[in-house]
Amino acid sequence: EEEEVDAYFVKVPVEKVFSEPEQDYAQRIADSLKRVGVSVVQIEDFDCSDEFLENHNITKTELSSIITDFLGKLTRKIVDLQELILVSVGGETSYKCCHSLDSKNLQLIDEVEPAIPLCLDYNSQWVITKSGNLGNPKTLINIVKYLEQHK
């Protein structure tokens, strides 16, 4: 049985991560949060081939850092436009997004699923972090359902 959640998907071409996040992305996501309630940002055309890395004169580690920096900056722009509950996937992504929001101390409020915390920072910013390789194919859907049940 396949479960679905209404969500707005924003696919950002990997080439865009080499510059500042465009305000258009932030505005589209903020608007979609008002309409749909769930927005997903995904880096598309993610090519980690040796050729891609050579063409950009970077290593895999540097590309990963560039992507997470971009996502952190985009998160800041979105939060400036719209209140939200941040759900981030991946340790480095979570760190960069929280850092961009100045969320240095997170207080554990609940556990959405095993090892997936619901936290609150001193600015009343809600944050859910999920390790990149933790969970199963339904984990993100379960997080959305948890949030819907606890509105």
Residue spans for each PLM region:
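Active-site catalytic microenvironments in core metabolic enzymes, especially phosphate/sugar-handling
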Residues: 1-151
